[in-house]
Amino acid sequence: MSEALGDAASHFTTEAQGERGGIGRYVNVDSVTPVEFLPGLGFRPVLGQRGMANFVSFEPGTEAPRHVHEEEQIVIVVEGEFTFDLDGDVRTMRRGDVAVVPAWVPHGAWTTDSSCLEIDVFVPPRESLLKLAEAQSAEASSAAAQAAGEQEPGGQPGGA
């Protein structure tokens, strides 16, 4: 096992050190309607208070063109593979591979014969995806409120 990171009690503190950031929620990514920004490139963003996770699906033969943005991005490959260009360092990424993209660093990705599912984590949330993510969040909150009305206290479904 690797060396301990430090005092577990301070890492897992139960004492708030500031204002609560809001109310937590659960999201099933399959319930998020995918938006196709380019043919074969589907986005399913999930918005947090200070960050965003975008579940991205690439069909075979799809490209996310080389681009830059002000948000830091962490790319996590969940299944399949794609080729990733990180400022000219081009690599094939597969399940478990992670790329860290600092702000304003050129990057892009493409698939050839296979598909790929990856998660992009943006801090702060990616500006160009905010309206989409906010709409998805509102839709999910509405569905969650409706589902909560159908459950008994303790989270169990109601009914006889």
Predicted regions and their residues:
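A short, N-terminal "cap"/entry segment at the start of jelly-roll beta-barrel domains
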Residues: 1-50, 131-160
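Conserved short histidine dyad/triad with adjacent acidic residue
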Residues: 38-39, 53-68
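Short beta-strand His + acidic residue motifs that chelate non-heme Fe in jelly-roll/DSBH
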Residues: 64-66, 84-85, 101, 107-113
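Ligand-binding loop in jelly-roll beta-barrel domains
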Residues: 103-128
